[in-house]
Structure formats: C-alpha cells, structure tokens
UniProtKB/Swiss-Prot annotation:
Zinc finger (C2H2-type): 3-27
Protein name from the UniProt record: Uncharacterized protein C17C9.11c
MF terms (GO), sorted A to Z: K48-linked polyubiquitin modification-dependent protein binding; zinc ion binding
Gene3D superfamilies: Phosphatidylinositol 3-kinase Catalytic Subunit, Chain A, domain 1
Annotated Basic and acidic residues bias: 120-136
Amino acid composition bias (Low complexity), ranges on this chain: 155-166
Organism of provenance: Schizosaccharomyces pombe (strain 972 / ATCC 24843)
BP term (GO), one: negative regulation of proteasomal ubiquitin-dependent protein catabolic process
Claim: Metal-binding is one of the keywords in the record: yes
Length: 240
C-alpha cells in the first residue's frame, strides 16, 4: 500500500510512515495511490543522509544559540535581582543605623536633661538646708540668755544640734517628680508604699541615687531612714 499526502504530495510506504509524517508535519490528508515510490540510488541516499545530518547539525546549533541566549538573559535577570536585593539590604541597614543613632542622641539628651534636673534639685536642697541652719542659728542666738559665772571660776558652754525629725525625698520616675516627707523613724518600705500610692505604681523594690551613686535594696528596707546615708534629704529613683 502506498499513501500520498495531499498537502505536500509525499509518497509514504505504510500507515505507520503516514502517522509519523503527520506527527512531524501536522498534515492529516492522505489517500491511496497507484504511484510507486521511486527507489533512490546509493548516491541519492548518501545525499539525503548528508542533508539530514546538516539539518540536524543546524537544528542543534540553533538550539545551542537559543540556550546560550536564554542563559545570558537569565543571568542578567538574576544579576539585576541580586543588585536590587543588595541595594534594598543596604537601604535597610542605613535606615537601621540612622534609627540607632537617633535613639542614642535622644538618650543622651534625656540623660543630660535628667542630670540637669537632679543638679538643680541638689542645689535647691543645699540652699534650703543652709536657710534652715541660718534660721536655727538665729533662733538660738535670740533665745539664749547670758549666764554669769563667779570670778576665777572655770566656765564651759556646749551647743547641741538637734537632729532632724523628718526626711524629705524627691522621687523621680518616668518624667514625674513627687516630693515625700516622712518621719525619721519610718523605713524605706513605708516610703516605697507612699511612692506606690502617690504615683499610682506598684511599690518599688529598690531606690538609687545619682550623686553620689548608691543603691538601696530590700535588705535595708526595714531600717529607719535616719540610719541611712541618704537622710535627711535625697533625690531618689525608684526601680522594680
């Protein structure tokens, strides 16, 4: 049986060859024919084989060039993506460093402002204590009566300073200032309770001073404040 492709006039020796031809060319119009398939001479077969080889070689070269171009394109896309990713990473790092720098500057400014406030409070406390001493000395001079001693008798006089009966503490927390006065016999625990009530926080478990730097934990919370070196007045920072 010989089949002829009506679309390209090619003669095919079997149904299988027609199916193969249809697969390669998408031709689907065939009919039986009485024509005979001309047998090729050895030279024609050789030329046909050589032509097929050339076509296969050309096809392979085209595929190689296409693959190379595709590889170049993919490399450019990848390189561009990597550049964009690296640029985005650098931008994020720069922004993070800028935020850190701003935080450091803000913290330094807040520390300087806090130090300024504490120094001002210490200066006010010094002036207040100096004024209290001046008033006390003036009162002693005004109320002291002269004592006459017999001639040739040894005389002596003593002046006893009355210890403070209360402590005055300036509590600094989160931008708030709370001044609390407690009796000299009261403890740091009682002071902590007053801090909690007046500043609407939980009772602190520790107090610190900045000038001079010192800390007072729960191990001294039950001691009277007049037994601690922060008496009679101090600027305290509560901690939890």
């Amino acid at each position: 049986m010989v089949l002829k492709c009506l679309e390209c006039d090619k003669l095919l020796s079997s149904i299988e060859m027609a199916e193969f031809h249809s697969t390669k060319t998408s031709h689907d119009q065939f009919e039986e024919t009485e024509e005979e398939i001309k047998k090729r001479s050895p030279e024609e077969l050789k030329q046909a084989i050589e032509a097929l080889r050339e076509k296969a070689k050309e096809k392979k070269e085209k595929e190689r060039i296409l693959a190379l171009e595709e590889k170049k394109t993919n490399y450019k896309i990848l390189q561009k993506s990597n550049d964009e990713t690296a640029q985005a990473m650098r931008k994020m790092q720069d922004q993070a460093r800028l935020r850190d720098l701003q935080k450091i500057r803000q913290q330094k400014a807040e520390d300087a402002e806090q130090r300024k406030k504490i120094l001002a409070e210490i200066e006010r406390d010094k002036k207040r204590r100096a004024a209290e001493r001046e008033n006390k000395n003036s009162s002693v001079k005004e109320t002291a009566a002269p004592i006459k001693q017999p001639k040739n008798a040894n005389s002596s006089s003593t002046c006893t300073r009355t210890p403070p009966t209360s402590g005055r503490f300036s509590i600094r927390h989160d931008g708030q200032v709370c001044n609390i006065t407690i009796a000299a016999e009261e403890t740091l625990r009682q002071l902590a309770q007053q801090v909690a009530e007046k500043m609407n926080v939980s009772p602190p478990t520790k107090f610190t001073t900045t000038f001079p730097r010192a800390s007072y934990g729960t191990d001294v919370f039950d001691k009277p404040v007049n037994q601690l070196d922060l008496f009679p007045s101090a600027v305290l920072i509560p901690q939890w």
